[in-house]
Every structure is written in structure tokens, then in C-alpha cells.
Amino acid sequence: MSARFPVVTGLGIIAATGINVDEIWNAIRTGTSGLKPLTLFQSPRYGQIPTGEISHDLVTLGAPTRGSRSDQLGWLAARDAIASAGIDLS
């Protein structure tokens, strides 16, 4: 039996430095940090620790309204990876 290797055909990412591959790649090239004060929830350590929070409204970006925030972030990244791969799911 021959070995089978995975192949990356598309990329999708959402992070504190950007909401797509181009924005994040630009942040890497320019040395832009995504660390900033926490805004999504209250914390007793507010202002003491910088956070890499994704503060965008995920539903506005096209995420489903159901599921956890982690589900929504994963869905957005997967959607971009599928589009980047040129796969049409319709």
C-alpha cells in the first residue's frame, strides 16, 4: 500500500490581526500586533493583560447565528478555505 499525503488546497484564517488571509499576511509583513485591551466581556484583570481578541461581529461577517463563538470562528475560516480552494458547494 502506498503512503497517502495530505494536500493543502485552500487557506482560511480569522485572528486578532485580521479576518482573512490577506489581512493577516499584511499584518505579519508589517509587524502589526493584534494585542489590545479586552472588550468582549468583563474581567477582573482588565487592562493588566493584553488580549488577542477578535472583536468583529461574526454574524455580520456571515457566520451562522447558531452555535458557540468558537463554532462561528471555525465556520468563517472553513468558508474562506473552501473558497480559496475554488470549491463550489452549491
Q: What role is predicted for each listed range?
A:
Residues 1-90:
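Conserved "HGTGT" condensation-loop signature of ketosynthase/thiolase-family condensing enzymes
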